[in-house]
């Protein structure tokens, strides 16, 4: 079967396939099957054919449509909100120009990455995403071990990202207190308790409130956009401004590297981090109607919209930092809060931060949903301990509740680690960006290999790169590898335990542990998702 040929029996468009988003999410109507039974999972004929090809039963309910999934991905990444509290590394290494330019070049560099993943999500729209794609597209002799390692690193990355999201909520609540209470010291155990509360809220919204999750995504996205202007405009009106030369040419090397060029390349880590995570939509594929079309569109729409919101906000931050060092030394530890304090009274700063915290709580709910789907999918393929239990769905909500519980417990435990050492906590969660990049590069590298070696075995994709597949995939692998390399560098020189980027040893330890676990247990029961794929089962 060629990449441009639909499989036999697939109805590419019918009247019943056209399901539009309502004003607040997705229409909640069950379709009638041709045999008279209700289609409780809300699958279209194309969805059913895709699941049949991949050897899967439809267990989850397809409540999401394209626009509600784009809103979901935008909320999961919450790009301008998270970005404002991640800019410190770029200000230390390279200064304002480093932050500006790296935001632009990483947006451009990630385009082939998301085009490639959008195509794979169209070929195989499934919750496992990257590890499934590795299994389906890798060489036969290597697919089991490569997809197993990719499954572990993907799972660890999303677990780390989930913990980072709830921690930011906790520390921002402490920041609100610091702004209003002069003598508050913001002890770590307070943050940990706030993290636990944030995790419980996320679980409630993601699992207990799952049946209404898809309804409020578009409304949440609207708030996400309106709050953006509520933050942006007062800063431009009131905050002191830097000069054009400071913003575009005023490179700095506070990290003490031996050249400005090296400092700028090391300082691009925020620019890289701003771009990862949009593939959260791919992990929700089994809950999106007409997923092979809707998910790729949602990913690319989110990719574009995120930059439209992100770059003006980064521009705003850079133009309203006339002096970087006081911002880095601010008692809240967040340069952006320093900018807010220079542009408005404490009461307004508090209001802005409260709005951001509310949006981030919504982001935590969506990200927990994507993280639990990834763990559920890997457990379904016997990739983790206690797979049978983790792959179970709750009978009432019809969601992977057990996977969500484990995800919350992991965040609880990491919150306890934060009490003893914030360095240890950030060391573990630093896996988020590098592990995701590894999954991106490996899965795209596998489809590039198959596209060159066995193009006739690529499944049909409504969103296909066609003749541009090889150059786009190649560019994606190259840029993903480039980003992966720079994501390991520490923030300053000489390197200290506090300033060391622990992602490198922890990532290697995670890969080594996955290989050991595969050798002991995985090779006996993990066969890779391709073992179920139609036409590939006997390879």
Annotate each PLM feature.
Residues 2-97, 115, 525-539:
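Membrane-interface "cap" regions at the ends of multi-pass membrane proteins
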Residues 126, 150-170, 275-287, 349-387, ...:
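Membrane-helix boundary/coupling elements in multi-pass transport proteins
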Residues 131-143, 166-193, 282-292, 297-303, ...:
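Helix-loop-helix connectors at the membrane interface of multi-pass transporters/channels
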Residues 132-143, 178-179, 254, 304-365, ...:
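TM-loop-TM module centered on a large, flexible mid-protein loop between adjacent transmembrane helices
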Residues 183-190, 218-344, 349:
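Helix-loop-helix junctions that connect adjacent transmembrane segments
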Residues 190-248, 276, 299-303, 429-440, ...:
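Membrane-interface loop-to-helix entry segments
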